[in-house]
Amino acid sequence: MEDINFASLAPRHGSRPFMGTWNEIGTSQLNGGAFSWSSLWSGIKNFGSSIKSFGNKAWNSNTGQMLRDKLKDQNFQQKVVDGLASGINGVVDIANQALQNQINQRLENSRQPPVALQQRPPPKVEEVEVEEKLPPLEVAPPLPSKGEKRPRPDLEETLVVESREPPSYEQALKEGASPYPMTKPIGSMARPVYGKESKPVTLELPPPVPTVPPMPAPTLGTAVSRPTAPTVAVATPARRPRGANWQSTLNSIVGLGVKSLKRRRCY
């Protein structure tokens, strides 16, 4: 049997496989030994039991008995109870005082008006003396009394009034009358109305160029063919076959399916 090289299957660090007795993975020799919680808990229990045994020995010794007798003579147990009771009472009294002070403070705040409604003294404004130079006052001239006349200015004003006479009736007719009566009172839309003797003005323009080429004149020996209009195909809607009964209507919607033919043959 050939030897199988298991080193190729082992994990590698570069080109070196982690396989052999030189490196034991997962044992207590890895990184100084494995950490065990059971050993820690057993160590704590051993330490507690040793302290308990030492305390029992000290309590049951002669020194412990003398200490207990001395404490009993001094009523140490009663003093401890009284101290605890006084401490609890003191804590309760302090809590009651703090609660009463808080209640009194809230009552005083409710009786007093809010700060916004209290009359605050106006702020003191520092008076600063500033010398302002006012412009000199213009003295208006005294008004003349009723008996005195108003002095005239140096330049006298003359008022010239020009009067124009209205034009005569004939001149107004010549200037404003239109030569012909108008159809509409609006100036931009008005057109003059001509009499019967006037002739309409026409523009002499050349005849228009025909867009369709002229047809040749027919001769005596040839028959004239009339132009025929192009035929236009009109799409007519297909009529749906109407069934005589509901079965034919259903067959037209669903279909008849595969047609089958039954024949009886004798052999």
Curated annotation (Swiss-Prot):
Post-translational modification: Ubiquitinated by Nedd4 following partial capsid disassembly; which might play a role in intracellular virus movement during entry.
One Gene Ontology term from the biological process aspect of the record: microtubule-dependent intracellular transport of viral material towards nucleus
Motif PPXY motif: where in chain: 166-169
Motif (Nuclear localization signal): 149-153, 262-265
Keywords: Capsid protein, Cytoplasmic inwards viral transport, Disulfide bond, Host cytoplasm, Host nucleus, Host-virus interaction, Late protein, Microtubular inwards viral transport, Phosphoprotein, Ubl conjugation, Viral capsid assembly, Viral penetration into host cytoplasm, Viral penetration via lysis of host organellar membrane, Viral release from host cell, Virion, Virus entry into host cell
Stretch list, region Interaction with hexon protein: 48-74, 250-256
Ribonucleoprotein is among the record's keywords: no
Residues the UniProt record annotates as site (Cleavage): G33, A34, L256, G257
InterPro entries listed in its UniProt record: McpVI (IPR004243)
Top-rank lineage group of the source organism: Viruses
Designated name of the protein: Pre-protein VI
Gene name linked to the record: L3
